[in-house]
């Protein structure tokens, strides 16, 4: 009988984590411009500014917005899953983790977007009459006839639209990465970025969402050069003193 398991000595391959791409501030501004008036515009702006997950974007409800206190609470999601081989919409009154439930400030530009969304919904409901879908009246992100915007729609439409406009390829989820990276570049503390994104651990924030852009790398290189130049100057000074 073998006393030890030979497999215990086998070194398993390391799991490589996917490293997404990110957009710079300039690229995000260009992105917002090309999506103006597009059905996916609200999803793109929300994911990029608030760093929301796809399920959180489509799961936003009106009761999560407090126009008086100027806050928006991320507490609902919508999942899309297969049931008997068919994709089904599954609303959830909970987020991915406990820490994912978070309250964020409702800034003026985004408040204007929400007010316009609500106005459009009211107008569409009057125009459509009995044809208007009443299943998702509590939700913010619906189409002209009141149907919820499906998570898969955001993914596929986003990809196709980028290709159509010759924009660098990123996933819809990479808008969340871009949000975190821009916050990091602006000097926002990692703990605050963690709270903004709703991560359960700060390690997730640090390891996944702090993609350094080229400018950050150049700044780091210049800092090293500065240190080396300083040391060279000091060394020369010491040499002169020794004479």
Segment roles from a protein language model:
Residues 69, 80-82, 88-101, 108-110, ...:
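C-terminal secondary-structure termini that scaffold catalytic or DNA-interacting sites
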């Amino acid at each position: 009988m073998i006393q030890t398991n030979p497999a215990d000595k086998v070194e398993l391959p390391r799991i490589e984590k996917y490293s997404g791409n990110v957009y710079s501030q300039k690229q995000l501004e260009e992105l917002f411009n090309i999506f103006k008036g597009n059905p996916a515009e609200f999803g793109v702006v929300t994911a990029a500014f608030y760093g929301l997950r796809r399920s959180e974007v489509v799961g936003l409800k009106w009761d999560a917005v407090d126009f008086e206190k100027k806050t928006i609470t991320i507490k609902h999601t919508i999942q899309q899953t297969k049931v008997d081989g068919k994709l089904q919409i599954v609303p959830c009154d909970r987020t991915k983790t406990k820490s994912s439930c978070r309250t964020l400030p409702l800034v003026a530009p985004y408040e204007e977007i929400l007010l316009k969304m609500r106005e459009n919904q009211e107008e569409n409901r009057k125009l459509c009459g009995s044809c208007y879908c009443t299943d998702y009246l509590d939700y913010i992100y619906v189409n002209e006839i009141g149907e919820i915007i499906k998570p898969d729609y955001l993914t596929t439409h986003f990809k196709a639209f980028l290709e159509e406009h010759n924009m660098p390829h990123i996933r819809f989820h990479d808008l969340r990465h871009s949000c975190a990276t821009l916050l990091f570049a602006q000097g926002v503390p990692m703990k605050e970025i963690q709270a903004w994104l709703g991560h359960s651990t700060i390690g997730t924030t640090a390891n996944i969402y702090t993609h350094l852009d080229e400018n950050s790398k150049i700044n780091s290189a210049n800092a090293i050069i500065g240190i080396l130049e300083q040391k060279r100057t000091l060394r020369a000074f010491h040499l002169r003193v020794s004479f």
